[in-house]
């Protein structure tokens, strides 16, 4: 189920100053909406180091490829898949990591990254 431009606009017109965060949205948002609102995406693939990890399930692809460094990013949302400017990144040594530990570390690092993002970019304090 993919919302169209009108559905996005109908919902978001009630929140013109909103900061929108995406977590596993997996849909392309129309350019008109991306340009009008502050939308950010958390992506569990280190696309600054491995651009081929854009798109779905990057953490699984990185694990299967045995990347020695893994991580996550927060980027501005554009109409292209994971094409927006990367604003924050965090990474870790994934050498010899188990898949179970990879999921745990990525979750922890992603949560930390969002907290740092809100503090730095949006001026939130303790």
What are these regions (language model features)?
Residues 1-126:
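One-carbon transfer enzymes
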């Amino acid at each position: 189920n993919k919302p169209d431009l009108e559905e996005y606009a109908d919902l978001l017109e009630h929140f013109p100053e909103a900061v929108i965060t995406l977590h596993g949205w997996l849909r392309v948002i129309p350019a008109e909406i991306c340009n009008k609102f502050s939308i950010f995406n958390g992506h569990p693939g280190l696309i600054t180091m491995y651009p081929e990890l854009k798109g779905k399930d990057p953490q699984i692809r990185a694990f299967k490829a045995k990347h020695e460094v893994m991580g996550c990013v927060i980027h501005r949302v554009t109409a292209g898949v994971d094409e927006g400017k990367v604003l924050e990144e965090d990474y870790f040594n994934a050498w010899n990591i188990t898949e179970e530990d990879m999921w745990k570390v990525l979750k922890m690092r992603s949560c930390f990254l969002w907290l740092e993002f809100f503090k730095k970019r949006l001026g939130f304090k303790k």
